Design a protein with these regions (language model features):
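N-terminal segments that cap or nucleate solenoid repeat domains
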Residues: 3-52, 57-60
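Amphipathic alpha-helical scaffolding segments comprising HEAT/armadillo-like alpha-solenoid repeats
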Residues: 20-33, 54-66, 85-97, 117-121
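Short inter-helical turns and helix N-cap capping residues of alpha-solenoid HEAT/ARM repeat scaffolds
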Residues: 37-38, 68-69, 99-100, 104
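Conserved hydrophobic register position within alpha-solenoid helical repeats
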Residues: 45, 76, 107-111
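Long alpha-helical HEAT/HEAT-like repeat alpha-solenoid scaffolds in very large eukaryotic proteins
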Residues: 102-109, 113-118
């Protein structure tokens, strides 16, 4: 069995993820990781929340949108676009105006994804 780095939060058991309780545990785990001191863990949390596409992640992701680490901010923007919740549009537009051009591209894609979701495309 692989030994876990004590600084990396453990991941919920994959077998549990098929049950409603397991899904709740996974969601809670990733939401807690969004505030981890390690930016790599915050990035992983945003990535996982974007893949889950659970709208309950929208509020915490919006809160994480202005993270100190640019890689985390961009991944959070991607996750919000993946979820497609229109509540993220205002904060994403604000972040878009603040970031450099290379980050603006990904943030713009997230805004477009949410706009498409809203229009039913």
């Amino acid at each position: 069995m692989e030994e876990q780095d004590p600084k990396t939060p453990s991941r919920p058991d994959r077998e549990d993820s098929t049950t409603a309780e397991g899904s709740e545990q996974r969601l809670g785990h990733y939401l807690r990781m969004l505030s981890d001191e390690n930016p790599g863990n915050r990035w992983k949390a945003a990535d996982s929340l974007g893949r889950l596409k659970d709208p309950r992640g929208t509020g915490p992701l919006i809160d994480a949108l202005f993270d100190d680490d640019v890689r985390v901010r961009v991944k959070v923007a991607w996750a919000l676009g993946s979820i497609g919740d229109p509540r993220a549009l205002g904060p994403l537009r604000q972040l878009y105006r603040m970031e450099r051009q290379d980050q603006q591209e990904i943030i713009g894609e997230a805004i477009e994804a949410i706009t498409r979701t809203m229009s039913g495309e």
